[in-house]
């Protein structure tokens, strides 16, 4: 599934996309809308992003999942920042009508072949918090998650899914069966 075309084909299926999110987030998700290869233009039309897979849940959270095989070409961390910012643009109205409280919680997930942080974790989850009071979260509703197919340190179901994405073969010894 690390192949872009195969990944997008699978994510078109709402149930498959929902399963991927449920495994990564370790919580039940009810998806209402799914889009693949969705293009979001910057308001001035100068820059755009093409989301591999996007979804909205029944609790109005929005999710973007990006498969990033080559992490050497670009800074995936900064790319996640840009993606998250542009995902908010279509939701906001210009001028005095802007009401930021209507921005939905947003989860941006990058799945990479390599561990871009080099700390040997299958998943890294980031939310913004105060440097002086680390227990104080900003509460802006943004979560950025970086999963990788290199490390096997993480929840068994997550590692199994990532290993399956890395080598999509039922004979892969690093995957476990997820019974529904």
Regions found by a protein language model. Name each.
Residues 1-179:
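Elongated, amphipathic alpha-helical interaction scaffolds
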